[in-house]
From Swiss-Prot:
Keyword NAD (UniProt): no
InterPro entries associated with the record: Aldolase_class_II_sugar_metab, Aldolase_II/adducin_N, Aldolase_II/adducin_N_sf, Fuculose-P_aldolase
Catalysis: reaction(s): L-fuculose 1-phosphate = (S)-lactaldehyde + dihydroxyacetone phosphate
Stated name of the protein: L-fuculose phosphate aldolase
Amino acid sequence: MDKKQFIKICRKLYDRKYVVGSGGNVSVKEGDKIYLTPTGSILGFLKEDDIAEMDLDGNVIKGKPTSEKNLHLMIYRKRNDINAIIHTHSLISTFLSTINKEIELLTPEGKIFLKKIGYVDYYEAGSLKLAEETAKRDEDVIILKNHGVVCLGKDLIDAYIKVEVLEEQAKLTLLNLLVKK
């Protein structure tokens, strides 16, 4: 696993305010191993040695994985095509979920990269129920009501691009709402 790229993506998420404080988490699956951000970590200050490791059976190999580890684990078990997961608290995407407004795919990039957005009702962060309901979704981009977003990818860059494009579509959706009033 490319730990330098993992750290670089985590810093981008933090620097671009897709996550704040100790919010959000990232994972990469390689073979039967999952590399995850540790619980309570601040993604903008993560170091290579901080990265936690688990196997696909849920056994911790190194560190203390994110409290959302079950969400990552259940998605990887269900989706063989997914090798990276990014969970953020992107501001506009999350805000729209609080007012029950679905994000519209308004540009070619939105339609190409996101295709379709899934939605999950509110469940407590880190709960087994949240993990189960999220893993039931077939989309690569999932909005967690009043919580954040989960973007899945064939690799870390693919998942990251979906985070960026989703937030752009959310901003456009919000602007559309404001103009229509």
